Amino acid sequence: MNQPLAYVHPGAKIAKNVVIEPFTTIHNNVTIGDGTWIGSNVTIMEGARIGKNCNIFPGAVISAIPQDLKFQDEETTVEIGDNVTIREYVTVNRGTVDRGKTVIGDNCLIMAYCHIAHDCIVGNNCIFSNNSTLAGHCTVGDFVILAGM
């Protein structure tokens, strides 16, 4: 269900049974899988690939350009697996030309205020506690619980 107060670019591919709450912005070249819920005031920028049955809470920003001075607007992505929960005010930056993508695997919980920088690879079944951050180019295996400030 697309709320009339949300903006969804005509070039975005939204599957069935996706709920998009008011004041959310979804840019061009975005794919969102079936059964995903997107809360209010979420921004999903170009290059986002979001799997099935995900929950993205208010204030999250997905697929913003990387915070890397070498970035020259290359076409890169953020790939989020199935059954991922992204809590309030999480930021996930898309990749650079190095890896070309930032990846979050299936069944992950990314708690409030986390930051996952460009070119990171997060495995399946991971939990990031509140305020955890990854600098660019980090790799996190499966079943990792990450905490830190």
Residue ranges and their predicted role:
Residues 2-148:
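Structural signal for interior beta-strand "rungs" in well-ordered beta-sheet cores
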